[in-house]
Amino acid sequence: MLGIIGIFAYKLNEYFSEPVINAKSINLDASPSPKSKIIERLKKDQKIKVLKKNNNTDWWQVEIGSQKGWVASWLIQKKNYNTKNAGRLAEATIVLDPGHGGVDSGTQASNGAMEKTYTLRTALKVYKLLKAKNVHVIMTRHTNKTVALASRPALSNRVKANIYISFHFNSAGEQNAAEGYEVFKYHHNANSFASTIDKQFNNLPLYNRGVSFGNFEVLRDNKRPAILVEMGFMDSDYDFSYIQKSSYQQKVANDVTKSLTSYFN
């Protein structure tokens, strides 16, 4: 099982008529942990009954025949997905990647505030907005967890994400040496969405540094349309005065959601 911690909570009566195994094969585990004892291997297209969802992780308790156990929720295919009032965006799979986490704090502001805190807060706000639109959205982490860098694009590739967004805040290495937000892309398949979100970000109160090529592992190893957004400089007094505010994080989240809606619809 993948060791990525995410969140994938559905209202079953709204989203499923019948859950089905989507991967070639997955483990049915005795407990919601990748280190758990394996009860059996489930095969693609097997039908299961969902008994319980752990809303703080990506694990679901399921029943198949007389066996009960736990599976990773992103390996369950959604059937009869409810697209009412959501349009084509509701048919997409979006992966949100809050940068850093756990032992990796990322960069820091002059007061010691850590990048990992604000990437998570911002991504969670996007997650909430997308879920309200019935979007199939997966997060690489939803708490202060350590997530291996390579596993982030691996998850995007595995679930065949239609869009992958990695959230970050920048650092110039010297106080007040640079400022502004920036959108990075690596592969050509991300060009269109990178331009869309950059235009939407124009109403942010920070300087627009534009769209740039970014040779980052989470983009380079990602076969899906993937971007990385640096939403301001942690070591800029001006930028950080906004970064630390929930209202700025919400504004970024609103713009990301509007960009996705525009891109798909």
Residue ranges and their predicted role:
Residues 1-30, 38-44, 53, 77-88:
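SH3-family beta-barrel domains
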Residues 32-37, 145:
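Short alpha-helix capping/helix-loop boundary micro-motifs
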Residues 38-74:
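SH3/SH3-like beta-barrel superfamily modules
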Residues 80-195, 200-203:
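Catalytic-core regions of hydrolytic enzymes
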Residues 137, 208, 226:
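Hydrophobic anchor at the start of a short beta-strand
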Residues 149-153, 211-216:
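Alpha-helical scaffolding within the catalytic cores
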Residues 166, 184, 212-265:
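Active-site-adjacent mobile loop/cap segments within catalytic or ligand-binding domains
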